[in-house]
Structure formats: structure tokens, C-alpha cells
Amino acid sequence: MIASSAKIHPSSAIENGAVIGENVKIGPFCHIGPNVVLADDVEILSHVAVIGHTSVGKGTKIFPGAVIGGDSQSVHHSALNTKLVIGENCTIREGVTMNTGTVEHGGATIVGNNNLFLAYSHVAHDCRLGNNIILSNNVMLAGHVTVEDRAILGGGSAVHQFTRIGRQAFIGGLSAVSYDVIPYGMLNGNPGVLSGLNVVGMTRAGIDRPAIHRVRRCYKQIFEGDGSIRANAAAIRNEYLDCAPAIEILDFIAAESDRALSSPNRGAKG
């Protein structure tokens, strides 16, 4: 079904079954597959493929050379019952690739709203991305990665499968992220190590200075204490019940995960 207000270049191929919303714009030489849903006001420039069971949210804009909804790059891939869901008002720049999920792990790759994907970044199968995230040029997310709201990943950084990146974390360019990164954490290097807190991001998010000082103290207690990271976090939780950012970090540490936790020292700690 193609809305009457949609504008589609005659050189583009729209397969039967595709759903094209109101005011959608599709430029030249694009391919829209039969199981694709483009919500209202989506804009697709030239030479874009949107395939698979893929839905693209309202107002999202996709630039030339992107391939959205391709099969997962997994040896266990099955095209049955797998999908890619992209939220509203995302910007997907040149050469970006996003894959559908795998049946073994729920079948869906989920991307939230207002995200910016710069050129040649990659979102692999079964990833879960929140809102207001930035993936800079050539960022690579392996399968099953979780990226929480407002995280920023610097150019060329690579994230190991099943890794979690917490809310408003900042990953430096060319970093290798092999272990979970706490909310508000800054990570740099290969191998990646924590280098402190994203204080600039915290300030921009409206977290006041007294709260930031408390989170810094919490960070030191977690990573400089005598026990493991998780033991240290559990021991101090009651001290921070009135400090939401600190509790967010402590709850992130306590949550189950397939990966260990990034730390300020080489390697990971539990």
C-alpha cells in the first residue's frame, strides 16, 4: 500500500506488499522490499536498500548507500520471523548497515528514537538501542549489544557481542569495548579502560553539581574498594538511595550480564 502523498522516483523499485506512509519521499535507484513499512514523513535518498521485515519510524531520514534490514551476519541465521524495528526521527547516514535479529534470541533488532548513525556504522543482529544515541563514523556493534539512552560512541570504536553500554556513557574513538560500560562512564583505548565519568554529559542532562560530586565518590568506592566491583557496589547501595544517578550505576552493576565490567585498570573485573 502506497499513500497518495508519497513521492517516489520512477527508477526506484517498490515491491508489492510494502507499506509506504504519507509524505514519504524515496529518491532514485532505491529498493524497498515486500515486508517493509515506512511510516509517515520518512525520507530516503538515492541508492538505499530497505529489505527484510523492517519498519522505519516517522520522520527518519536515510542517506545514500545504506542497507537497512539485511540478513543477520550469523552462521545460525534464519530469515523466518526475524525483523528490524527503527524508531522515529533517526538520521542514518551514508553506508550504514543494520541487520535483522536471529530466531534463537527473540528475532528482533530494536533501534529507538532520535538516534544519529554516522557514515558506515554497523548495527548487528539482536542489538537493542535506546534513544538519542550517537554512533560516529565506522562504529561497529556486534550482535546482542545493548546501548542505553544518550550514549555516544566515537569513530571507529568496536563493541564485543553481548556487551552493555550504559546511559550517557562516552566511548572514545578507536576504542575496543569488550566489557560492560557503566552509565555515565568514559572508556578509551584498546583494550578499553574506564577513564572516569562523563561529567560534561551529566551536566548537560541537568544533573546538579552536588549530585555529580556524590557520583564521583560512588565511582571511587566501587573501583578502588578492596572487594570485587559487584561486592563493592552492593555494600554501598544504601548510602546513595537519594542519589538517582548513583543508584542507576549501582543497579547496572548488579544486573545479570553475559560480560564482565569495564574498570579503570587493564582488563575487566566482576
Curated annotation (Swiss-Prot):
GO biological process per UniProt: lipid A biosynthetic process
Compartments annotated for it: namely: Cytoplasm
Q: Which reaction does it catalyse?
A: a (3R)-hydroxyacyl-[ACP] + UDP-N-acetyl-alpha-D-glucosamine = a UDP-3-O-[(3R)-3-hydroxyacyl]-N-acetyl-alpha-D-glucosamine + holo-[ACP]
- Alphabetically ordered keywords of this record: Acyltransferase, Cytoplasm, Lipid A biosynthesis, Lipid biosynthesis, Lipid metabolism, Repeat, Transferase
Please, which domain of life does this record's source organism belong to?
Answer: Bacteria
Which CDD domains does this one have? LbH_UDP-GlcNAc_AT
Cite the annotated pathway.
Answer: Glycolipid biosynthesis; lipid IV(A) biosynthesis; lipid IV(A) from (3R)-3-hydroxytetradecanoyl-[acyl-carrier-protein] and UDP-N-acetyl-alpha-D-glucosamine: step 1/6
What does this protein do, in the record's words? Answer: Involved in the biosynthesis of lipid A, a phosphorylated glycolipid that anchors the lipopolysaccharide to the outer membrane of the cell.
* Subunit comment: Homotrimer.
Q: What is this protein called?
A: Acyl-[acyl-carrier-protein]--UDP-N-acetylglucosamine O-acyltransferase
Q: Which organism is it from?
A: Rhizobium meliloti (strain 1021)
